[in-house]
């Protein structure tokens, strides 16, 4: 793929032609086009054609960076007092049908003393989105921004509901629904946390997506992030084989590969993690925070261990597992969930 032009701006029709020709748009060009979309100043037919052209070509890193910068300008920001802030929002789209692992990891990490702003939405391609399961757990997902900010400062965790905090997305809802396929916007959620997360444990559904997201984060303002893709296809830390992790820090990238042994845990096949719907996912999370042993617990311990290592709370994954297990066994995780639902 090549950069389409040195021209800092392109019309929608020109951008569509360039993308259909296999040319990547620059960050500046993409940003201007996304900005027009989010202001409601773009023709819906051209928006759809451009999104499809980018999808068919394959979204470039420059396009992700430009789109993320534009989307961040339009989001409702959540103010807070934390210097270190974690998000566990991933791209979704793995089709694995598991319970909401990243949501459980977010709550457990908060119980371990890490400030967390969990960004998420209702289900799109999965059986249960983070907003759906949190609603089943009694969390008020549509709180006003000042309430979200207060919750983050007071108890160290909040839920940033994408549908509420990205109001400009209303301008592209119709065309995305008509297209009915994943587009550039499906990759932007993890890059646009309304609270400005400094650290991200970010799962991706495909190796090529993992590489693009990591490269985009290196150009954006992440302090340190782990971009994940598991050998079994999960967009999480997996205990079913190897998990690839690209560590992004200070604009540089470093590759890691983790196995269950690195966590001191036994393998878990992803079939053991299935959840049919949000209520079942919520019940799994309640039970594991209640102390139930087994595959669900071990998988969340592994994810939390990675999060704790990411923010510098521990120096090893096995130490992270020990601290996360203590947070469950002491009922700190259960208490944190109750606080979040109050």
Curated annotation (Swiss-Prot):
Its EC number is 2.4.2.18. Mg(2+) 2 binds at residues 235-236. Anthranilate 1 binds at residues 90, 121. The gene is trpD. Anthranilate 2 binds at residue 176. Its cofactor is Mg(2+). Homodimer. GO terms for cellular component: cytosol. Gene3D superfamilies: Nucleoside phosphorylase/phosphoribosyltransferase catalytic domain, Transferase, Pyrimidine Nucleoside Phosphorylase, Chain C. Catalyzes the transfer of the phosphoribosyl group of 5-phosphorylribose-1-pyrophosphate (PRPP) to anthranilate to yield N-(5'-phosphoribosyl)-anthranilate (PRA). Belongs to the anthranilate phosphoribosyltransferase family. Transmembrane segments: none annotated. Binds 2 magnesium ions per monomer. It catalyses: N-(5-phospho-beta-D-ribosyl)anthranilate + diphosphate = 5-phospho-alpha-D-ribose 1-diphosphate + anthranilate. It is an enzyme of class 2 (transferase). Mg(2+) 1 binds at residues 102, 236. Pathway: Amino-acid biosynthesis; L-tryptophan biosynthesis; L-tryptophan from chorismate: step 2/5. This is Anthranilate phosphoribosyltransferase. InterPro entries: Anthranilate_Pribosyl_Tfrase, Glycosyl_Trfase_fam3, Glycosyl_Trfase_fam3_N_dom, Glycosyl_Trfase_fam3_N_dom_sf, Nuc_phospho_transferase. Keywords: Amino-acid biosynthesis, Aromatic amino acid biosynthesis, Glycosyltransferase, Magnesium, Metal-binding, Transferase, Tryptophan biosynthesis. One of its GO terms (biological process) is L-tryptophan biosynthetic process. Pfam families: Glycos_trans_3N, Glycos_transf_3. 5-phospho-alpha-D-ribose 1-diphosphate binds at residues 90, 93-94, 98, 100-103, 118-126, 130. GO terms for molecular function: anthranilate phosphoribosyltransferase activity; magnesium ion binding.
């Amino acid at each position: 793929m090549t950069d389409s032009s040195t021209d800092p701006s392109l019309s929608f029709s020109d951008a569509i032609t360039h993308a259909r020709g296999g040319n990547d748009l620059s960050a500046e060009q993409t940003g201007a086009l996304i900005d027009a979309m989010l202001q409601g100043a773009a023709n819906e037919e051209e928006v759809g054609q451009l999104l499809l052209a980018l999808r068919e070509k394959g979204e470039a890193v420059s396009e992700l960076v430009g789109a993320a910068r534009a989307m961040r300008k339009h989001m409702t920001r959540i103010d807070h007092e934390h210097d270190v802030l974690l998000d566990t929002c991933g791209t979704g789209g793995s089709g694995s049908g598991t319970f909401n692992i990243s949501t459980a990891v977010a709550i457990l990490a908060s119980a371990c003393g890490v400030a967390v702003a969990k960004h998420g939405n209702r289900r799109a391609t999965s059986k249960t989105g983070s907003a759906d399961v949190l609603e089943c757990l009694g969390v008020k997902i549509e709180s006003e921004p000042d309430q979200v900010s207060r919750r983050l400062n007071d108890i160290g965790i909040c839920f940033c509901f994408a549908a509420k905090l990205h109001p400009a997305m209303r301008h592209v809802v119709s065309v995305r629904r008509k297209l009915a396929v994943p587009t550039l916007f499906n990759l932007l959620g993890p890059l646009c946390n309304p609270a400005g997360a400094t650290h991200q444990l970010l799962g991706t559904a495909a190796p090529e997506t993992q590489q693009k997201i990591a490269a985009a984060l290196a150009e954006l303002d992440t302090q340190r992030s782990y971009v994940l893709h598991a050998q079994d296809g999960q967009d999480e830390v997996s205990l079913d084989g190897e998990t690839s992790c690209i560590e992004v820090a200070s604009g540089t990238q470093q590759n890691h590969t983790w196995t269950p042994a690195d966590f001191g845990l036994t393998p878990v096949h992803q079939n053991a993690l299935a959840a049919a719907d949000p209520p079942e996912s919520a019940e799994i999370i309640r039970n594991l925070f209640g102390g139930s042993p087994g595959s669900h617990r071990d998988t969340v311990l592994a994810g939390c261990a990675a999060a704790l290592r990411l923010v510098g709370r521990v120096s090893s994954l096995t130490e992270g597992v020990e601290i996360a297990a203590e947070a469950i066994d002491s009922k700190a995780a259960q208490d944190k969930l109750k606080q979040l639902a109050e």
